[in-house]
Amino acid sequence: MKRQSMDDERSDRDGLRGHLPDEDDASTTLVNLSPYYGHLDCFSGICPLVVKTNRFTYAPSYPPNDQIQNTWLSIALEGIGALFSYCAPRAAFRQVAVIGTGNGLDVVGISRIVRPPEIVASDIHPGVIQAARWNIAHYVAEECKVTVRQSDLFTDYPAGEAFDLIYENLPNIPDGTDLFEGIRSASCYAPRAHGVRSACDRYLLTLHHDFLVQARSRLHDSGWVVCLIGGRFPVRVIHRMFRTAGYRSMVVGFGLKIQSEADVVLPAYAAVERENGSSFAYYHPLEKCISISRELSQPTDLLSRGGYARRLTERLRNCRVSATEAARLHHDGDSVCHTVYVIAGSMMPKERSDG
């Protein structure tokens, strides 16, 4: 019998429902998957969840979720749900990939919203895969076949494997921030070796750009990519990145998130501001940001969400602080937040040949 590969293991419900391989390193966390922008019917009966985490996984700490999220998961899931409803009359998301799955809760949520027959989930960190497999085995319905593998973007995906929907949750963290060993998968990545890409490098979007370029060969013709990106800069920078990579793009979700791992991340962003002249947007005080966000409701109409994001960002203008100021505020005991964009992209039509 051929032995199953550790890097490409099918989720075996019977084998994974027991213990994590490193049980001493595991703990449980209560998390509510219901998005705060309207509780989707598909989440009924599964919230809250008691999920497995370890020292490598991002552990949500707001059970249930607050108006300002400490985790971006519900913002992403609501955006994916809106895109699915928008596309449902014309297209089905049957093959789905999740890049940078972390503890696997994005797979759980997507399986409930999209209900695809097949999901492939991957993360670069081997320690994360343990927790992801356990959570997926416990909370994804058996009708959905899930493959969990360790991979740096699409490096370990078989040639020719393609999808209708590819969702990514990748970090835009300063290169000098050493988070790979011992913190959380959502904030770590392998160093990239390539030249300067102007705005992509300036705003720490290189990893997202690499994903978009590689995803083109992994999408079916009518497929979609969905990127979750911390919006510490103008959204036009993100749309330009999509366009140069060959995609049309639109905002499908938007929200506010408290900066996690602030002791490490905020000084790193402040250093980038000093070194290359970038300007990153944080918001403070939280109470005022919460009040402003509650005054504006995210529209159900998908095509109106870009305008909503612009209006809310404009309303938050007087709360904006730089990363340098945000680091000082955090040092003094205050929390800061930033915006989060869920951006969907579809491939631009190929140019016709004159011949």
Where do the model's predicted regions map?
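Class I SAM-dependent transferase core
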Residues: V31-A91
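S-adenosyl-L-methionine
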Residues: A131-G160, L165-E168
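Conserved Class I SAM-dependent methyltransferase catalytic core
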Residues: R202-G255
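Conserved SAM-binding motif I beta-strand of class I
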Residues: E118-D123
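N-terminal auxiliary segments of SAM/dcSAM-dependent transferases
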Residues: K2-P48
